[in-house]
Amino acid sequence: MQIVLASQSPSRLMILRQAGVEPVIHPAHVDEDAIIAQLAGAEPDEIVTRLALAKAQAIAPEHPGDVVIGGDSMLLLDGQLQGKPHTPEATIERWRQQRGRTAHLITGHAICLGERRVVEASRTTIHFADASDTDIEAYARSGEPLQCAGAFTLEALGGWFIDAIEGDPSSVIGLSLPVVRRALYSFGLNASDFWTK
């Protein structure tokens, strides 16, 4: 039995590796925009968990005896969910809106083993620094935040611009180890069953 990560996120992979797990990487290809459109008016936690579940369910049939993990993260600011900015221009615009403010990073998790599944969202409060225009532009040009929910990272250059967080740090990076541990326990498994070091 292995852990299968239904994601190509380097951050999610890093979290698992640092926690002693070498997962099988099997990115799921789902139409996120179509799923979000179907969920118009839904609560933010439901949106991120449904995206995570779609990813896990897309590949779970190919891994019937393995633990499959799907995840999705979005930033909630002023009642609006924000995913990845994709461009330096969008990153700069978002940072000008969020600097000096507080927002919530919501990570949806779907952990499946055969027909069993645990679906849960974790929410962490982010206190953004009042970053200068020069730093915002340099950060955007670095390319680092372009593929990150909320246009920031906690574990790399973005760490300069986060004053504090309240909640689970691993969830902010992309995958809550406490959520995964609870799911494993509910399946009668232990986290240490998957350690490779």
Curated annotation (Swiss-Prot):
A Pfam family hit: Maf
Entry-linked InterPro entries: ITPase-like_fam (IPR029001), Maf-like (IPR003697)
The EC number(s) this enzyme carries: 3.6.1.9
Top-level enzyme category: hydrolase
Compartments, as annotated in UniProt: Cytoplasm
GO cellular component: cytoplasm
Gene Ontology terms describing biological process: nucleotide metabolic process
GO molecular function: nucleoside triphosphate diphosphatase activity
Entry cofactors: a divalent metal cation
Keyword presence, Cytoplasm: yes
Domain of life: Bacteria
Active site, per annotation: 72 (proton acceptor)
Catalytic activity of the protein: a ribonucleoside 5'-triphosphate + H2O = a ribonucleoside 5'-phosphate + diphosphate + H(+); a 2'-deoxyribonucleoside 5'-triphosphate + H2O = a 2'-deoxyribonucleoside 5'-phosphate + diphosphate + H(+)
PANTHER family for the chain: BIFUNCTIONAL DTTP/UTP PYROPHOSPHATASE/METHYLTRANSFERASE PROTEIN-RELATED, BIFUNCTIONAL DTTP_UTP PYROPHOSPHATASE_METHYLTRANSFERASE PROTEIN-RELATED
Family that this chain belongs to: Belongs to the Maf family.
Function: Nucleoside triphosphate pyrophosphatase. May have a dual role in cell division arrest and in preventing the incorporation of modified nucleotides into cellular nucleic acids.
Descriptive protein name: Nucleoside triphosphate pyrophosphatase
